[in-house]
């Protein structure tokens, strides 16, 4: 079962680049790109960091596929 992510949507709403988000989250731009394209599922730690940066619950950012 995969994960559906709203990282791209939330990042774009805020006018942030992948590089800006990556710097704030302490990861590479490639990691953010891989999360946004569904090639990489973030660790719990990274998911929580992103939730804090977006000021939104983690379950709003990430959902299991088929649970929408």
Which functions belong to the PLM regions below?
Residues 52, 62-68:
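Short, charged recognition helix plus adjacent turn
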Residues 1-2:
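A detector for short, charged/polar N-terminal pre-domain segments
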Residues 22-24, 33-34, 67:
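Alpha-helical and His/Cys-centered functional microenvironments
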Residues 39-49:
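Short, basic-rich loop-to-helix N-cap that marks the start of a DNA-contacting helix
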Residues 5-24:
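Short basic helix-loop element that most often maps to the first helix and adjoining turn
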Residues 27-40:
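Recognition helix of helix-turn-helix/homeodomain-like DNA-binding domains
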């Amino acid at each position: 079962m995969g994960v559906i992510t709203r990282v791209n949507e939330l990042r774009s709403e805020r006018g942030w680049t992948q590089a800006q988000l990556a710097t704030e989250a302490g990861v590479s731009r490639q990691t953010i790109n891989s999360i946004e394209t569904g090639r990489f599922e973030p660790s719990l730690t990274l998911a929580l960091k992103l939730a804090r940066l977006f000021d939104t619950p983690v379950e709003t950012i990430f959902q299991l596929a088929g649970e929408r």
